[in-house]
Regions:
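Amphipathic alpha-helical surface "interface" segments used
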Residues: 163-171, 238, 279-284, 469
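Extended, charge-rich alpha-helical regions
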Residues: 12-15, 23, 183-187, 191, ...
Length: 489
């Protein structure tokens, strides 16, 4: 029967030559395990627009990161301390405990690093195109560094009529703050309102909990303009979580990150003189850079935190700071030996070196999460839908890298796109990797051909950019703007 067909997420070649990265002298013959779709007659090359030779320094480039960096206000930390004893078990159950705890830490940003890495971003593939290969922020990174769940219902799902009553209560509070001295539901006004008002019954405690999660979502997870207020569009999500329903926050947050990186890349290419405001929280991108590029890490994180029992992975980067010159950063980003493919170690799902399916996956949230890490799909955000391409960065997830195939774009409703993400654990099969990942000879040859083919166009584009990159009427710039458009459902 058709409904019994298993979807296999991993392709296997029982005997193939695998290279250790781009070092052609380190080869081995073994079984190769690849994420699908891969190894087709017409592989999907990276976007040529992603390798435009953008100048190393752009003094006139105006980018504001302030809105995307919430810090961790003292009042917020007080609220976490107040509610954690009461709700920690519930947060653990729906998968947000690490995310809430991580929000109590301050993470400093290095704007030079963020701008430099954005220059390598490809909006077409949602990956960074480095000279040595592709890499990206994955769902695993959002789970490990952001503490956000990949499992649960879609963030666009509406609550039931019973739950809707709590949404209405939050709207009333928001209206009250609009009429107060604050004039709007600012973060400080919101938290003070609930810290000063002690709940006297279960309903009051429930509304405070929903208000708390609404602020957490607005500040740290699904931030949208205006950036200094609690957003009413997160009320539906917050109240559903209060009622014990898990929500898939990681794909929503990752979709927003991809969207804003694509917008920032277009801004950089055009050398736009107007100020560009980054709204999506970039904390996780900064942490991703520190995890993946050891030479760009703050030294204090290695020595000061050694041996400490930290509450979350992200906490090792709390309050540390570094400032590097743009040329130093670019050199590190372009070096194939400077990138750590698996900084978190091997997957924690167990069953290494074996195939899993059916009941094994149904019984394990870890296996269900891992399946979403490795499966090409769509990320449904609050206001955008983005492609997710783990098969292009398979080594980050422990798999060998072959030539990636095109993942088809489905122009459909968000519900249909969500069905691609929301897999049925009974109907999937995949392999849990147990060896150091490498690349195939075909991939190395294909990548070299891509790099060679782009060298000529890079030189030509560089000349165009030098002649007048700031002019939006320049025909070369027009071509690049077209190349970097993002498809959004």
């Amino acid at each position: 029967m058709a409904d019994e067909v298993q979807e296999v997420l991993v392709s296997v070649n029982p005997s193939i030559t695998i290279l250790s990265g781009h070092n052609e002298s380190k080869v081995s013959s073994r079984a190769g395990y690849f994420l699908v779709p891969c190894n087709v007659d017409s592989p999907d090359p990276p976007s040529a627009a992603a390798v435009i030779p953008i100048p190393a320094t752009q003094a006139d480039l105006q980018v504001n990161f302030d809105k995307s960096w919430s810090g961790s206000p003292k009042l917020w930390r007080r609220w976490v301390e107040k509610l954690r004893p009461r709700h920690e078990a519930a947060w653990q159950e729906i998968g947000i405990l690490d995310g809430v705890v991580t929000s109590t830490w301050r993470f400093n940003r290095d704007e030079n690093v963020l701008l430099e890495i954005a220059k390598f971003w490809s909006p077409r593939t949602n990956t960074f195109i480095f000279p040595w290969g592709e890499a990206t922020v994955t769902l695993e990174d959002l789970a490990v560094l952001g503490g956000l769940p990949v499992l649960g219902s879609c963030v666009r799902e509406k609550p039931t009529p019973v739950v809707q009553e709590d949404v209405n209560e939050l709207k009333i509070v928001r209206c009250n703050l609009n009429a107060s001295k604050y004039k709007k539901p600012t973060f400080s006004g919101w938290v003070k309102y609930f810290l000063e008002d002690i709940p006297t019954d279960s309903k009051g405690e429930r509304i405070e909990h929903a208000a708390f999660l609404s602020m957490w979502l607005s500040m740290f997870v699904l931030k949208e303009a205006p950036f200094d207020v609690v957003q009413p569009n997160v009320f539906d999500i917050a109240v559903q979580m209060v009622h014990g329903k898990g929500m898939a926050l990681a794909p929503a947050a990752l979709a927003s990150l991809y969207r804003d990186l694509s917008s920032l890349k277009r801004h950089i290419i055009c050398n736009n003189q107007e100020k560009f405001v980054v709204g999506t929280p970039l904390n996780v991108l900064q942490l991703w850079i520190w995890e993946r590029f050891p030479a760009l890490r703050p030294k204090r994180a290695v020595s000061f935190l050694e041996g400490r029992n930290l509450p979350t992975r992200a906490a090792r980067w709390g309050n540390v700071q570094t400032r590097l010159d743009s040329s130093d950063v670019r050199g590190e980003l372009e070096s194939p030996t400077r990138f750590e493919w698996m900084p978190y170690g091997s997957t924690n799902v167990g069953l290494h070196g074996s195939w899993v399916s059916g009941d094994d996956i149904v019984r394990s949230k870890e296996l269900q999460s891992f399946a979403r890490y490795i499966r090409a799909s769509y990320l449904i955000g609050m206001y955008c839908t983005e492609k997710y391409h783990p098969h292009r960065v398979a080594r980050q997830l422990g798999f060998d890298q072959d030539m990636p195939a095109t993942f088809p774009r489905i122009r459909s409703s968000w519900k249909e796109s969500w069905r691609r993400y929301d897999l049925n654990p009974q109907r999937i099969t995949f392999f849990v990797p147990d060896s150091q990942p490498g690349i195939t000879k075909d991939y190395m040859k294909w990548w070299k051909e891509f790099r060679c083919a782009t060298d000529t166009s890079k030189k030509r584009m560089a000349a165009v950019i030098q002649e007048g990159a700031s002019s939006s009427t320049d025909p070369g710039i027009k071509r690049q703007r077209q190349d970097t458009q993002v498809s959004v459902s």
